[in-house]
From Swiss-Prot:
Originating species: Archaeoglobus fulgidus (strain ATCC 49558 / DSM 4304 / JCM 9628 / NBRC 100126 / VC-16)
Protein name: tRNA (pseudouridine(54)-N(1))-methyltransferase
EC number: 2.1.1.257
Task performed by this protein: Specifically catalyzes the N1-methylation of pseudouridine at position 54 (Psi54) in tRNAs.
InterPro entries: Alpha/beta_knot_MTases, TrmY, tRNA_m1G_MTases_N
Region (Unknown): 1-94
Subcellular location as annotated: Cytoplasm
Cleaved signal peptide residues: none
Substrates-to-products reaction catalysed: pseudouridine(54) in tRNA + S-adenosyl-L-methionine = N(1)-methylpseudouridine(54) in tRNA + S-adenosyl-L-homocysteine + H(+)
Family designation: Belongs to the methyltransferase superfamily. TrmY family.
One GO-annotated biological process of the protein: tRNA methylation
A Gene Ontology term for the protein's cellular component: cytoplasm
Subunit relationships: Homodimer.
Binding site for S-adenosyl-L-methionine: 221-223, 242, 265-270, 275
Amino acid sequence: MENPDSAFLLFRNAPRLPLATMHTPLCGDSHQPDFAFRKPARDALLRPWNGRNHRCGLQDGREICQGQLPAHQKSYWSDCAALPRLFRAYGGAVVRGFLIVGNKAFTQPFSLNDLPGAGRMDVLCRCTSQALFISHGIRRDVEVYLLLLGPPSPPKSILIKGDEVRRMSPDERNVAGHIKKALAVECGKSWKKVHSGVYVSRKGLEELIEELSEKYSIIYLKEDGVDISNAQLPPNPLFVIGDHEGLTEEQEKVVERYAALKLSLSPLSLLAEQCVVIAHHHLDRLQF
Protein backbone atom coordinates (compact mmCIF):
# COMPACT_ATOMS: atom_id res chain seq x y z
CA MET A 1 0.00 0.00 0.00
CA GLU A 2 1.11 3.56 -0.63
CA ASN A 3 0.99 4.51 3.03
CA PRO A 4 1.47 1.71 5.59
CA ASP A 5 0.14 3.95 8.35
CA SER A 6 -3.28 4.52 6.76
CA ALA A 7 -6.52 2.59 6.91
CA PHE A 8 -8.37 2.05 3.67
CA LEU A 9 -11.71 0.92 2.42
CA LEU A 10 -10.97 -1.60 -0.30
CA PHE A 11 -13.61 -2.48 -2.85
CA ARG A 12 -13.31 -4.99 -5.65
CA ASN A 13 -13.06 -3.25 -9.03
CA ALA A 14 -12.88 0.12 -7.29
CA PRO A 15 -9.97 2.41 -6.31
CA ARG A 16 -8.66 2.55 -2.78
CA LEU A 17 -10.38 5.12 -0.62
CA PRO A 18 -8.26 6.49 2.27
CA LEU A 19 -10.25 7.14 5.41
CA ALA A 20 -7.64 8.91 7.50
CA THR A 21 -3.95 8.82 8.29
CA MET A 22 -2.75 7.44 11.59
CA HIS A 23 -0.14 9.48 13.39
CA THR A 24 1.69 6.35 14.54
CA PRO A 25 1.54 2.74 13.36
CA LEU A 26 -0.40 0.62 15.85
CA CYS A 27 1.41 -2.65 15.23
CA GLY A 28 4.81 -1.62 13.94
CA ASP A 29 6.11 -0.35 10.61
CA SER A 30 6.39 -3.83 9.12
CA HIS A 31 2.68 -4.55 9.32
CA GLN A 32 0.13 -3.64 6.71
CA PRO A 33 -3.38 -2.37 7.47
CA ASP A 34 -6.09 -4.99 7.43
CA PHE A 35 -9.23 -2.88 7.44
CA ALA A 36 -11.11 -3.76 4.30
CA PHE A 37 -14.54 -4.03 2.83
CA ARG A 38 -14.62 -6.73 0.19
CA LYS A 39 -17.39 -6.75 -2.38
CA PRO A 40 -18.47 -10.23 -3.51
CA ALA A 41 -20.82 -10.60 -6.43
CA ARG A 42 -23.74 -8.75 -4.93
CA ASP A 43 -23.25 -7.41 -1.42
CA ALA A 44 -20.31 -5.57 0.12
CA LEU A 45 -19.40 -7.60 3.19
CA LEU A 46 -17.09 -6.69 6.01
CA ARG A 47 -14.01 -8.82 6.53
CA PRO A 48 -13.33 -9.52 10.21
CA TRP A 49 -10.23 -7.76 11.49
CA ASN A 50 -8.30 -7.22 14.69
CA GLY A 51 -10.33 -5.06 17.05
CA ARG A 52 -7.73 -4.92 19.80
CA ASN A 53 -5.61 -2.30 18.02
CA HIS A 54 -8.01 0.25 16.65
CA ARG A 55 -9.22 3.80 17.03
CA CYS A 56 -12.68 5.26 16.73
CA GLY A 57 -13.51 8.85 15.93
CA LEU A 58 -15.40 11.18 13.67
CA GLN A 59 -14.50 12.31 10.18
CA ASP A 60 -16.91 14.43 8.13
CA GLY A 61 -19.60 13.67 10.67
CA ARG A 62 -19.20 9.90 10.30
CA GLU A 63 -17.94 7.43 12.84
CA ILE A 64 -14.80 5.68 11.69
CA CYS A 65 -12.56 2.93 13.01
CA GLN A 66 -8.95 2.28 12.14
CA GLY A 67 -6.64 -0.59 12.84
CA GLN A 68 -3.72 -2.67 11.69
CA LEU A 69 -3.22 -6.41 11.82
CA PRO A 70 0.07 -8.31 11.83
CA ALA A 71 0.29 -10.40 8.68
CA HIS A 72 0.91 -13.60 10.64
CA GLN A 73 -2.04 -13.11 12.94
CA LYS A 74 -5.57 -14.43 12.35
CA SER A 75 -8.23 -11.80 11.69
CA TYR A 76 -10.69 -11.06 14.44
CA TRP A 77 -13.75 -8.83 14.53
CA SER A 78 -13.70 -5.29 15.83
CA ASP A 79 -15.35 -4.61 19.16
CA CYS A 80 -16.47 -1.21 17.90
CA ALA A 81 -20.23 -0.69 17.81
CA ALA A 82 -19.80 1.89 15.04
CA LEU A 83 -18.84 -0.69 12.43
CA PRO A 84 -22.33 -1.65 11.18
CA ARG A 85 -23.25 2.04 10.81
CA LEU A 86 -19.92 2.77 9.11
CA PHE A 87 -20.48 -0.11 6.76
CA ARG A 88 -23.93 1.12 5.73
CA ALA A 89 -22.62 4.68 5.33
CA TYR A 90 -20.32 3.49 2.55
CA GLY A 91 -22.99 1.46 0.78
CA GLY A 92 -22.33 -1.93 2.35
CA ALA A 93 -24.95 -4.48 3.32
CA VAL A 94 -24.78 -5.88 6.84
CA VAL A 95 -26.39 -9.30 6.59
CA ARG A 96 -27.30 -12.13 8.95
CA GLY A 97 -27.11 -15.85 8.39
CA PHE A 98 -28.28 -19.00 10.11
CA LEU A 99 -26.90 -22.50 9.58
CA ILE A 100 -29.16 -25.24 10.93
CA VAL A 101 -27.61 -28.71 11.11
CA GLY A 102 -30.15 -31.53 10.76
CA ASN A 103 -28.29 -34.73 11.58
CA LYS A 104 -31.24 -36.97 10.71
CA ALA A 105 -33.11 -34.77 8.23
CA PHE A 106 -34.07 -36.75 5.12
CA THR A 107 -32.11 -36.09 1.94
CA GLN A 108 -34.84 -37.25 -0.42
CA PRO A 109 -38.41 -36.00 -0.99
CA PHE A 110 -40.61 -36.76 2.02
CA SER A 111 -44.27 -36.73 3.01
CA LEU A 112 -45.60 -33.31 4.00
CA ASN A 113 -48.02 -35.12 6.32
CA ASP A 114 -45.24 -36.43 8.59
CA LEU A 115 -42.50 -33.84 9.02
CA PRO A 116 -41.26 -35.20 12.38
CA GLY A 117 -40.94 -38.61 10.74
CA ALA A 118 -38.70 -37.16 8.04
CA GLY A 119 -35.75 -36.85 10.42
CA ARG A 120 -37.33 -33.97 12.39
CA MET A 121 -37.78 -31.86 9.29
CA ASP A 122 -40.29 -29.88 11.36
CA VAL A 123 -37.40 -28.41 13.38
CA LEU A 124 -35.66 -27.13 10.24
CA CYS A 125 -38.93 -25.70 8.93
CA ARG A 126 -39.64 -23.81 12.15
CA CYS A 127 -36.09 -22.42 12.24
CA THR A 128 -36.42 -21.27 8.63
CA SER A 129 -39.74 -19.59 9.34
CA GLN A 130 -38.46 -17.78 12.44
CA ALA A 131 -35.29 -16.70 10.64
CA LEU A 132 -37.03 -15.21 7.60
CA PHE A 133 -40.47 -13.95 8.57
CA ILE A 134 -41.75 -10.94 10.45
CA SER A 135 -45.33 -9.69 10.70
CA HIS A 136 -46.56 -8.97 7.16
CA GLY A 137 -43.10 -9.24 5.71
CA ILE A 138 -39.81 -11.04 5.26
CA ARG A 139 -36.29 -10.19 6.40
CA ARG A 140 -34.48 -9.33 3.18
CA ASP A 141 -31.06 -9.26 4.88
CA VAL A 142 -31.18 -12.91 6.03
CA GLU A 143 -29.89 -16.12 4.47
CA VAL A 144 -30.78 -19.54 5.87
CA TYR A 145 -28.58 -22.58 5.29
CA LEU A 146 -29.98 -26.03 6.05
CA LEU A 147 -27.51 -28.92 6.25
CA LEU A 148 -29.32 -32.25 5.85
CA LEU A 149 -27.36 -35.31 6.96
CA GLY A 150 -30.02 -38.02 7.16
CA PRO A 151 -30.80 -40.94 4.82
CA PRO A 152 -30.59 -41.95 2.10
CA SER A 153 -27.87 -39.83 0.42
CA PRO A 154 -26.22 -37.25 2.70
CA PRO A 155 -25.02 -34.59 2.68
CA LYS A 156 -27.29 -32.02 1.09
CA SER A 157 -27.30 -28.30 1.74
CA ILE A 158 -30.19 -25.95 1.02
CA LEU A 159 -29.86 -22.17 0.85
CA ILE A 160 -32.85 -19.83 1.16
CA LYS A 161 -32.21 -16.14 0.45
CA GLY A 162 -34.59 -13.66 2.04
CA ASP A 163 -34.10 -11.06 -0.69
CA GLU A 164 -34.98 -13.49 -3.48
CA VAL A 165 -37.42 -16.08 -2.17
CA ARG A 166 -40.98 -15.98 -3.51
CA ARG A 167 -44.24 -17.73 -2.65
CA MET A 168 -43.05 -18.88 0.77
CA SER A 169 -45.24 -18.44 3.85
CA PRO A 170 -44.41 -18.93 7.54
CA ASP A 171 -46.25 -22.23 8.12
CA GLU A 172 -44.21 -25.41 8.41
CA ARG A 173 -45.97 -27.19 5.57
CA ASN A 174 -45.25 -24.45 3.07
CA VAL A 175 -41.58 -24.22 4.06
CA ALA A 176 -41.34 -28.01 3.90
CA GLY A 177 -42.75 -27.92 0.37
CA HIS A 178 -39.88 -25.70 -0.75
CA ILE A 179 -37.36 -28.04 0.90
CA LYS A 180 -39.00 -31.09 -0.67
CA LYS A 181 -38.83 -29.51 -4.11
CA ALA A 182 -35.12 -28.74 -3.59
CA LEU A 183 -34.39 -32.34 -2.61
CA ALA A 184 -35.92 -33.58 -5.86
CA VAL A 185 -33.33 -31.65 -7.91
CA GLU A 186 -30.13 -33.38 -9.02
CA CYS A 187 -27.11 -31.39 -7.85
CA GLY A 188 -23.37 -31.45 -7.26
CA LYS A 189 -20.97 -29.50 -5.07
CA SER A 190 -21.91 -26.15 -6.60
CA TRP A 191 -25.12 -24.34 -5.70
CA LYS A 192 -27.94 -25.12 -8.13
CA LYS A 193 -30.97 -22.87 -8.31
CA VAL A 194 -34.27 -24.64 -7.66
CA HIS A 195 -36.49 -21.57 -7.99
CA SER A 196 -36.48 -17.96 -6.80
CA GLY A 197 -34.31 -17.71 -3.68
CA VAL A 198 -33.86 -21.47 -3.11
CA TYR A 199 -30.64 -23.33 -3.95
CA VAL A 200 -29.34 -26.84 -3.31
CA SER A 201 -25.91 -28.49 -3.31
CA ARG A 202 -24.07 -31.51 -1.95
CA LYS A 203 -21.76 -29.57 0.34
CA GLY A 204 -20.89 -31.19 3.65
CA LEU A 205 -20.34 -29.35 6.92
CA GLU A 206 -16.68 -28.47 6.45
CA GLU A 207 -17.07 -27.41 2.82
CA LEU A 208 -20.10 -25.31 3.67
CA ILE A 209 -18.71 -23.58 6.74
CA GLU A 210 -15.39 -22.87 5.00
CA GLU A 211 -17.33 -21.16 2.21
CA LEU A 212 -19.48 -19.24 4.69
CA SER A 213 -16.46 -18.05 6.68
CA GLU A 214 -15.43 -15.99 3.63
CA LYS A 215 -18.68 -14.06 3.80
CA TYR A 216 -19.76 -14.20 7.44
CA SER A 217 -18.36 -14.09 10.95
CA ILE A 218 -19.19 -17.58 12.25
CA ILE A 219 -20.85 -17.71 15.68
CA TYR A 220 -21.46 -21.06 17.36
CA LEU A 221 -24.41 -21.03 19.76
CA LYS A 222 -23.70 -23.15 22.82
CA GLU A 223 -24.79 -23.02 26.46
CA ASP A 224 -21.21 -22.70 27.75
CA GLY A 225 -20.29 -19.82 25.42
CA VAL A 226 -19.91 -16.11 26.15
CA ASP A 227 -23.13 -14.57 27.46
CA ILE A 228 -24.76 -12.62 24.64
CA SER A 229 -25.43 -9.66 26.95
CA ASN A 230 -21.67 -9.27 27.51
CA ALA A 231 -20.48 -10.04 23.98
CA GLN A 232 -19.45 -7.64 21.22
CA LEU A 233 -20.94 -9.15 18.09
CA PRO A 234 -19.04 -9.01 14.79
CA PRO A 235 -20.60 -7.64 11.62
CA ASN A 236 -22.30 -10.12 9.30
CA PRO A 237 -22.87 -12.81 11.92
CA LEU A 238 -23.86 -16.33 10.94
CA PHE A 239 -25.23 -18.42 13.78
CA VAL A 240 -24.59 -22.18 13.77
CA ILE A 241 -27.41 -24.07 15.48
CA GLY A 242 -27.87 -27.80 16.00
CA ASP A 243 -31.18 -29.62 15.65
CA HIS A 244 -33.01 -31.36 18.51
CA GLU A 245 -29.91 -33.50 19.13
CA GLY A 246 -27.33 -30.75 18.80
CA LEU A 247 -23.97 -31.10 17.08
CA THR A 248 -21.76 -34.15 17.47
CA GLU A 249 -18.27 -33.80 18.96
CA GLU A 250 -16.74 -34.12 15.51
CA GLN A 251 -19.03 -31.46 14.10
CA GLU A 252 -18.22 -29.14 17.00
CA LYS A 253 -14.51 -29.42 16.22
CA VAL A 254 -15.14 -28.41 12.62
CA VAL A 255 -17.30 -25.45 13.60
CA GLU A 256 -14.88 -24.25 16.27
CA ARG A 257 -12.03 -24.15 13.73
CA TYR A 258 -13.90 -21.45 11.83
CA ALA A 259 -15.88 -19.78 14.60
CA ALA A 260 -15.05 -16.22 15.62
CA LEU A 261 -17.11 -16.59 18.77
CA LYS A 262 -18.91 -19.19 20.88
CA LEU A 263 -22.02 -17.50 22.20
CA SER A 264 -24.56 -18.43 24.87
CA LEU A 265 -28.16 -17.22 24.65
CA SER A 266 -29.18 -18.86 27.93
CA PRO A 267 -27.73 -21.19 30.55
CA LEU A 268 -30.63 -23.50 29.65
CA SER A 269 -30.78 -25.72 26.58
CA LEU A 270 -33.22 -24.00 24.22
CA LEU A 271 -35.19 -25.18 21.22
CA ALA A 272 -33.43 -24.44 17.95
CA GLU A 273 -36.15 -22.06 16.76
CA GLN A 274 -36.00 -20.20 20.08
CA CYS A 275 -32.30 -19.57 19.47
CA VAL A 276 -33.13 -17.98 16.11
CA VAL A 277 -35.71 -15.65 17.67
CA ILE A 278 -33.43 -14.55 20.51
CA ALA A 279 -30.53 -13.90 18.13
CA HIS A 280 -32.77 -11.75 15.92
CA HIS A 281 -34.13 -9.91 18.96
CA HIS A 282 -30.63 -9.04 20.15
CA LEU A 283 -29.46 -7.85 16.73
CA ASP A 284 -32.64 -5.86 16.15
CA ARG A 285 -32.14 -3.98 19.40
CA LEU A 286 -28.53 -3.26 18.44
CA GLN A 287 -29.79 -2.02 15.06
CA PHE A 288 -27.44 -4.40 13.25
